[in-house]
């Protein structure tokens, strides 16, 4: 099972999301997701989320919380432990991302975007400020 992080930055009623539209063979192609990626050797979840967020956006997280762990099980893909974060502050200048298009999406438009069905479950828990949680999702 691989370990990854995923972070959703929320500011002024909008969310910074990544539209995965640049790679043809991307399992997330055309989905709107948070910012994150795979752990590097000897990284903690905090190390990974800060590095991935900085690499993909140019922004440095300054306020964030660890929300939960989502276990993905699939007959089609390698299993994954995704460490989920919610951020409320950062510093720096947003830059282009080679993984897709970064965009600020108003909360009111968020639900209408193409997303994984499982994402809707953990995003609801995250937005409700649920205590630390663990989910298992099968695709």
Where are these regions (language model features)?
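Charged phosphate-binding loop/patch that engages nucleotide di/tri-phosphates or the phosphate backbone
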Residues: 125-139
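Short, charged/polar surface micro-motifs in flexible loops or helix N-caps
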Residues: 10-14, 23, 40, 89-93, ...
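Conserved Nudix-box catalytic region and its N-terminal flanking loop in Nudix hydrolases
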Residues: 15-51, 55
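Unchanged
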Residues: 39-62, 72-126
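Conserved N-terminal beta-strand and adjoining loop/helix that marks the start
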Residues: 1-17, 38-39
